[in-house]
């Protein structure tokens, strides 16, 4: 589908969801395109397996609706050619070595995943091979083959992560550095962020700049104001708001993300940021500061129904809600409007070209009474 048609379709779908629940006039500003339509992803997680039962080793992505079959996917339009060259190099090496992949049923085997990350601004690349501990195998020869690749970027680190969990997910039980270092820095709107293989970070770096610039525009001035960034992840939005704010407090349930947020804030010299690890529902009662502005950037399923009234009870003048799932946003907007807020404007940001996903940013304002009426009551 033509990219402009994709944008029109996404904007239309989101607007319909919003129009169905928004009760007042509001401005829908359409959709902002991703700066890159192809090759925009900065992270890929590949899985070892086979394309069919007892077939040759494959390294790629799961077939649609399949837990077991793997498709080797070089030529994917969502990443640049460096990913394909790394994928093919590792696949060919492991095929020659005859190493077994980890079987989900028997829980036996060695090879599990290949994780590749690339910094868009610097070209730094991290490669992480994830295996079980069921075998010992030297990765020195593979490291030499990777170093010899003709890449547009440059390999900053080649890592080996061990994961003996039975779950089909990348878990870091122990990581060794085979080559280089275990991190790089990515640049975003003038700030730098330390990225490790397991960092939480938007997968479209240039699209993230569009998204966060939009959020910053919607928020307006933060001078001398206290900002709550709820569901803050690695604190990207909080840090972008911090330079002129009185204070920014981020709350995030994933402790590793909070640690990264604190490290990045320190690296960027932002002393007015505070990051708290915990569930928003439980933590918010213990925060002594009162916000002037609230930013909401929840997971796909939206905000816990018990947390939302607590958040809204602060009665701040403005809330900016960033959503990666418009149907969850629409559901939450019903409650938000019930508690005295109205939608001023909204727009979409296409972070995921060639897919059906899109981000939505909404600005909400607290409705204040127009005035008051004095009533004199006389009792006879």
Map each language-model feature to its residues:
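Extended interfacial segments that mediate partner engagement and assembly in macromolecular machines
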Residues: 1-103, 121, 135-136
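Nucleotide donor/acceptor-binding cores
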Residues: 42, 123-125, 224-225
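Solvent-exposed residues in well-ordered beta-strands and their adjoining turns
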Residues: 47-49, 64, 117, 130-132, ...
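Short, acidic/hydrophobic/Gly-rich beta-strand patch recurrent on exposed beta strands
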Residues: 58-63, 128-130, 261
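Short helix/loop segment immediately N-terminal to the Walker
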Residues: 101-108, 227
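Short edge beta-strands and adjacent turn/loop segments
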Residues: 108-121
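Short, aliphatic-rich beta-strand segments
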Residues: 116, 123-132, 192-196
